């Protein structure tokens, strides 16, 4: 197995484990508040599915609207279209809709519920900053998100996380038949810790999908160093030119639009750039 396939496979296994953990947490919290009542648990399941349905079908429109992205034609951005057309052919994907975000910070994201209904948005800053090869690396990363259906994975994770938070609140306010001090402490602990645990797991899933997209992007463009170099320049650009971003859209971007350090790293949607670059440069022998 090549280094690229090993990296992608490893990220997939870790994502599966994290998704199972998140689902298990939902089942445990649902059982606590329902007292094992099947009807109540089905109600909570329906709530989570409704959130997921909305996220799946409308998240692309919301993301593009929140970012201020504007459709761009081939005559307006010929190099962008040329690069995406070449990379989609190599990846076996249909051509996504292309957008430009009128922001100076260099950044990009992909969205859409499946490859046939996908879009790639790049900022004005990234078009001005990166070389052609670096831009191809970034675009290949975003196309990998589309190929891997990461938007669906994140939608499911977000839906489960939202359901856990909602159920935790319900557990606190509705309480249970057991009014002993120990039961009350348990309810309070669940209310405080369950949403935090769900968020940490969601962020870990997001980080694993970024690693997988880096590996897949390196394979599609055929040059891991192009993506590694781009990531370093994008991180510098994000620091130098902050971008106002709705926090809900932050996980979509290839690099975090703003930095988080220390314990905040647990809640980061993106792995450290230095680790991403290190992994990409380890792939060079297998793709060279």
Summary of predicted features, one role per range:
Residues 187, 191-192:
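Hydrophobic alpha-helical transmembrane segments of integral membrane proteins
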Residues 1-21, 36, 40-42, 47, ...:
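Polar-ligand-bearing catalytic/cofactor-coordination segments
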